[in-house]
Amino acid sequence: RKHKDPYPGGYVKEPKVGMTEWVTSFDLNSLYPNLIVQYNMSPETLIRGGDDFTVSGVDHYLKNAVTDEPRQRNLSVAANGSMYSKEKRGVFPTIIIGLYEERAVIKKEMLRLKQENENANTAELKREINRLENTQQAIKILLNSLYGALGNQYFRYFEMVIAEGITLSGQLSIKWAEQAMNTAMNNILKSDDDDYVIAMDTDSLYVNMGPLVDAMKPKDPV
C-alpha cells in the first residue's frame, strides 16, 4: 500500500432520528493505546510476508473466532488480518504501559491533594493540583498520539498496516460492545432483536435506556 493511500478510520453509526429521554453513554477507555498493548502491535513484532497476512475484516471477526493456528504460534491477529508475535512485549506496548502507569500514579496523587485541599485550601496546593492535572493530560495526549504517528508517512516508524490494524480492531471492539449491549437489553426486556444503541462514534456508544426505565419503574411512583 502506498504512503498516501487512505485507510479506514473509526466507526460512526448513523444516529437514530428523534428525541430520546433516557440516554446512557459508554466509553471504551483509551481504546487505541489499549489495542496496541492487547495485540502487541509494534514494527518489530509485525509478522511480514504474504502467507502470514490474510485480510479478514471486521464483519468476519464479528461472526467468527480466530483460528487455532495463530494461537499455537503465539500470534495475535488484528481485524485487518495483520499478525503480531507475542513472544516478547513490543517497544510500543512497553512505552504505552509505562506512560499509563505513570499517569495512574499522578492521578492518584492529584486526587489525594484535592481531598487535602478541601480542608486546607491553600494557593500552594492549588498550584500543585493544576501542575498534576496538566501533566496527566499531557501524558493522555501522548498515549493517543502514538496511533496517529504510526499512520504518518513522515514518522520514522511509519507502518500503514499497523495503523489500519488499530482502527479496524477499534471498529471490531465497538461493534462487539454494541452486540453485547443489545443482547443484554433484549434478554432483560424479553424483546425480539431490537436495537437499543442509538449512536456510536469510534470508542463510544449511546444507549436508549427508556424501555428499561419504563419496565423497572413502579406502577404508582411517589
Functional labels for PLM-detected ranges:
Residues 1-222:
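Conserved acidic
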